């Protein structure tokens, strides 16, 4: 049992939390417990991470990626299946989950890839996997990708989507007509690529759009029944950072002009999900032009600092990083500090403002685009009532069947 300033039902209250068998039994002013310093927030959910491993384990592994998530106040990550090899069949899915079962510091779920090799049999693949594991979504589906097998055209996506009522499809929306194949440089990935793809896709169905980076795309989705996520780097960095970061700046979709960046941040309350798109590469690979940023460890701390300073509200932050991801992807028992839910929370001392330094982070890639940014990292992280940070305990679970 712990006591402190708990974020409960949309506001902070002085209360205690009693935990039994990993779940919250009671919350109230009369509940006794160990007093903690700072605010007690729901632990975050990052629905978009690329934990590499397999043939790219020199960049990141499931073990190092989930350790990084733990230190960032995240209790559950959703890994993307565009690995090498891609997770587009049951055997590869089971192999990756078996690897995760032995090594995760936080809870772990894995999406299923939609490829040109598997789209005709994805139903049977999904049924086989679902006998053992909970699959949050099909995706991230790439409308544009350097791999011909991973690049799915609109017609194929529409055909598959219509066969799977109730399944979440997550989309990387960049129209291939506007993207130079094989080039990660932002000059060749025009903002029109995202806008055009979103305009077409919202007419085809209800999707969850990954890493939206332009105001026009966001407005289009807001007028539909789809949902979308935005990354910290698309709200806190811009093309102006190219001079500071050099080749490190490469990311898909690319960093945008200040107009888009400022609109997304001003409208943070209107987005559905805050997700990191944690996509680590070594410095050597980045210098060679690889696209992607690490971010699972810095996302929550960056935005806790912004909330502490009044730029955003804690209510909005908790919605975007915890309760909305749980609702959209069906993670029952996650996302809110509430009786019956898992006792997953993070304690942040708002007076402990640090500067982000790569050498203190835990991702295997060894760098961050947010070097020198102010952040508030968690002092304690609880997963099903166990405090994990002090001893870096591997207490995570893989999500089995339906949560």
From Swiss-Prot:
The active site is at 277. Zn(2+) 2 binds at residues 140, 172, 211. Catalyzes the reversible cyclization of carbamoyl aspartate to dihydroorotate. One of its GO terms (biological process) is 'de novo' UMP biosynthetic process. CDD domains: DHOase_IIb. HAMAP family: PyrC_classI_A. Gene3D superfamilies: Metal-dependent hydrolases (3.20.20.140). Zn(2+) 1 binds at residues 48, 50, 140, 277. It comes from the Archaea. NCBIfam families: PRK04250.1 (NF003271), pyrC_multi (TIGR00857). Binds 2 Zn(2+) ions per subunit. Its cofactor is Zn(2+). It comes from Archaeoglobus fulgidus (strain ATCC 49558 / DSM 4304 / JCM 9628 / NBRC 100126 / VC-16). GO terms for cellular component: cytoplasm. Its EC number is 3.5.2.3. This is Dihydroorotase. One of its GO terms (molecular function) is dihydroorotase activity. PROSITE patterns: DIHYDROOROTASE_1, DIHYDROOROTASE_2. Pathway: Pyrimidine metabolism; UMP biosynthesis via de novo pathway; (S)-dihydroorotate from bicarbonate: step 3/3. Keywords: Hydrolase, Metal-binding, Pyrimidine biosynthesis, Zinc. Substrate binds at residues 50-52, 82, 281. Belongs to the metallo-dependent hydrolases superfamily. DHOase family. Class I DHOase subfamily. It catalyses: (S)-dihydroorotate + H2O = N-carbamoyl-L-aspartate + H(+).
